[in-house]
Amino acid sequence: MEPSRRRMTRDMLLLIVTMAWLVTGDEGGIKQEERLFNLGKLEMFVDKLPHIPTLHGYHFVNGFLKPKSLHIGMFFKKWKFHRDLPATPVFAYGTSKRSATVPGPTIEAVYGVDTYVTWRNHLPLHHILPWDPTISPAIPKHGGIPTVVHLHGGIHEPTSDGNADSWFTAGFKETGSKWTKKTTHYVNKQQPGNMWYHDHAAGLTRVNLLAGLLGSYILRHSSVESPLRLPTGREFDRPLVIFDRSFRKDGSIYMNATGNNPTIHPQWQPEYFGDAIIVNGKAWPRLTVRRRKYRFRITNASNARFFRFFFSNGLDFIVVGSDSAYLAKPVSTKSVLLAPSEIVDVLVDFSKSTSKTAILANNAPYPYPSGDPVTEENSKVMKFIINYKSEVDTSIIPKKLIEYPPAHVSTSTRTRYIAMFEYVSSIDEPTHLYINGLPYNAPVTETPKIGTSEVWEVINLTEDNHPLHIHLGLFKVLEQTALVKSEEFIECMTKRNDAVKCEISKYARGNKTAVTVHERGWKNVFKMMPGHVTKILVRFSYIHSNESYSFDATQEPGYVYHCHILDHEDNMMMRPFAMVL
């Protein structure tokens, strides 16, 4: 594939800047490059895969399950990502500074039992990473680092959703315009599945996650899940939280401090990519496994990197869940493409291996889909060392999983067009990204009715693949259709910003790309192909019962939908929506 004009321009700009450093002796630039840690010098697979600590969002009182209140802090500390890398300054979640980890503790909740979490900000006055005030509306008057926690995939009241403007600083000294309370309430009445929690402060999400503010959340429902006889227990059912980072020689996280349009945004870059692949807080770890089935709940917690996972020895993934919901039946596949924020729930049967080891590998270009090929460092994820002894395995791969009530387009109440725009400067470098031609802080334009379904036709007018995440609602992907005469359509949309007036039906009639089999279940985020219209059916009720929510979803501050490439989300590629009765 020919490189895009944008990439060519970016490469040329990088060359010019590099030459300027050499000619002018720009010590700051040269020193910055010299301080980068050469990751090729790190030996892979020397650290064991860590067990992430677990916090239970429930407890037993006289033999009965009861709600529990958790207090989880955000702390500044040092973290060892690799045996031979100096300790790294990070922000970490935990019940204390000593116990705080990257990723944060896995919260386990039980269906029907409320969990309450008081998130406490213990972070210092100044950030450990460069951040761009031209894109961040979350700027406190008296210093400190704004934070707010979003439970990704959670179905709960707006005041507990982690709205980007509901931020707070250390000790709740300052709060955002939509902050309401110190304690979040997770009602846990949705379908069982996998979620993750992470920071969501306006304009700071990318740097706060890069610093380490993320963790897993699992909702269990024993009467529904136990009959499936999937692998269980701490050894055989494990979250894998995966992200990419680069480092300086002193161990600190490297993030480019110069924007691609520095006269507009001094620091903002359209995507962050690191070369070390981190799993559960360790770079390229190893895990010794037995010859039996394991369950891995894999979260892509990267800022912008897509992963296309596969095993070096050809082992299959048996996909049982996608994002926060089970599939109707298991799907076997040789590879899995995971966008930032997506979760895939898989079984791997190591008894099928013909080799003693297997590398979990990656071959997704970055940016996806037409960026650079992977390198030696970012093409390796982790290593499995497979025990030679066979053993009895009582877990199974069931023929069926969980069948939810069907979703029919005929039941939808309306169709909405959601257009993704990217705007560039005179040097053809991105300056900002809008949805429907509007910034995040423009008034609400989408007002779905509680208990209904809507068809959203997502029109990607950019050259990037954008993972679209919808808070509260879940959806099914119906079809993906290429645009014909796309430049003509983009020109009209840029002028009129109206898909109907631009006669979308004339252009959305190109080749159709089938939805991958294991992504045909209920999703809360999906990859929107560039130059395509992706039709989804969004459900605004519980999918397991089709019942209305158990809370008032019409409250302020409402919900949002956005691109989950964090650098895009922070630079306006997010829109609010409000539920109505």
Curated annotation (Swiss-Prot):
Disruption phenotype: No visible phenotype under normal growth conditions, but mutant plants have reduced inhibition of primary root growth in low inorganic phosphate conditions.
Residues that, per the record, bind Cu cation 3: H200, H471, H562
Cofactor binding mode and count: Binds 4 Cu cations per monomer. The Cu cations are bound as 3 distinct Cu centers known as type 1 or blue, type 2 or normal, and type 3 or coupled binuclear.
GO cellular component terms, A-Z: endoplasmic reticulum membrane; Golgi apparatus; mitochondrion
Swiss-Prot/TrEMBL keywords: Copper, Endoplasmic reticulum, Glycoprotein, Membrane, Metal-binding, Oxidoreductase, Signal
Binding site for Cu cation 4: H466, C563, H568, M573
Residues binding Cu cation 2: H152, H198, H564
Any one GO molecular-function label of the UniProt entry: oxidoreductase activity
InterPro entries: Cu-oxidase_2nd (IPR001117), Cu-oxidase_C (IPR011706), Cupredoxin (IPR008972), LPR1/LPR2 (IPR052152)
Pfam families the UniProt entry points to: Cu-oxidase (PF00394), Cu-oxidase_2 (PF07731)
Positions contributing to Cu cation 1 binding: H150, H469
Signal peptide: 1-25
Domain Plastocyanin-like: start-end pairs: 274-361
GO biological process: cellular response to phosphate starvation; meristem maintenance
EC number: 1.-.-.-
Leading EC class: oxidoreductase
Sites where a glycan is attached: N256, N300, N460, N511, N546
Cellular location(s): Endoplasmic reticulum membrane
Cofactor(s) of this protein: Cu cation
Function: Multicopper oxidase that may be involved in copper homeostasis and oxidative stress response, and that is necessary for root growth inhibition by low phosphate conditions. Functions together with LPR1 and PDR2 in a common pathway that adjusts root meristem activity to phosphate availability.
Name used for this protein in its record: Multicopper oxidase LPR2
UniProt lineage: Eukaryota, Viridiplantae, Streptophyta, Embryophyta, Tracheophyta
